[in-house]
Curated annotation (Swiss-Prot):
Amino acids binding ATP: K231
Gene3D superfamilies assigned to the protein according to its UniProt record, in alphabetical order: Glutamyl-tRNA Synthetase, Domain 3, HUPs
Cofactor(s), by name: Zn(2+)
Protein name: Glutamyl-Q tRNA(Asp) synthetase
General function of this protein: Catalyzes the tRNA-independent activation of glutamate in presence of ATP and the subsequent transfer of glutamate onto a tRNA(Asp). Glutamate is transferred on the 2-amino-5-(4,5-dihydroxy-2-cyclopenten-1-yl) moiety of the queuosine in the wobble position of the QUC anticodon.
PANTHER family referenced in this protein's UniProt entry, alphabetically: GLUTAMATE--TRNA LIGASE, GLUTAMYL-Q TRNA(ASP) SYNTHETASE
GO cellular component, one term: cytosol
Keyword vocabulary terms for this entry: Aminoacyl-tRNA synthetase, ATP-binding, Ligase, Metal-binding, Nucleotide-binding, Zinc
Residues binding Zn(2+): C101, C103, Y115, C119
SUPFAM superfamilies documented for this protein: Nucleotidylyl transferase (SSF52374)
Top-level division of the source organism's lineage: Bacteria
Organism: Pseudomonas putida (strain GB-1)
Amino acid sequence: MTNSSYIGRFAPTPSGFLHFGSLVAALASWLDARAVNGRWLLRMEDTDPPREMPGARDAILQTLERYGLEWDGEVVFQSQRHDAYAAVVDRLFNMGLAYACICSRKQLEGYNGIYPGLCRNAGHAREGAAIRLRVPELIYRFTDRVQGEYQQHLGREVGDFVIQRRDGLYAYQLAVVLDDAWQGVTDIVRGADLLDNTPRQLYLQELLGFSQPRYLHIPLIVQPDGHKLGKSYRSPPLQVEHATPLLLRALRALGQDTDPELLVATPAEVLAVARKQWRPEAIAQKTTVPEADLR
């Protein structure tokens, strides 16, 4: 890939403040783009207003700026892209590739998250229903730049999946595929918790005629109880005054060498060195890293 053709992105959800796990993901994405003089875009995945936290959008932008992770172009907000999502849902539904589903959560208990196709041929009206995409009985596979080959049988391991919820909100799988294609994203660097989402996205890309980006899934930082760092587990928000030591810690989480002398450097100086020395092949080929190992 030539320097000018790389387009990466970071796409946080404004349901809370950025935490250390967010920093590791943002830093990996930023470095992978900047190391080849590529572009790095910022997209706010704000498709679920009930989960949004007041003030989180601005706080995320300010934190990234203070940590030196500057982006290219305007910030894209998924909440302003509903017309594009609606057009594709309509198209898929009218082509018979998607259908209305009125199954409740209670009805789906016991299926281990794999949709059994209860509404597949029922012909329900769209009003008040979720919209599911029909999946083929095929294996989708790709080679991740860190995790190696990954494959998933969509029919057996996932089942027909939701692209629009019953409340009218658009599902992550649909929005992320449409926005990555619209923005011309060539490389996706994100947490390994999304590894098993990727085959669904590959299918949507194929269905809609989009190019497949390269993927790099980094290990998640996990707490002693095995849960990933996240807003739902009250992970502490990033502190601006600790930017340099936290950047160095994030680099260690990504398997990168760090110089102790950089502890007295500015965030910009840390990033300048890290950008020159970026080695994605040094990232551990595993899906989790205990936070305690990074101290």
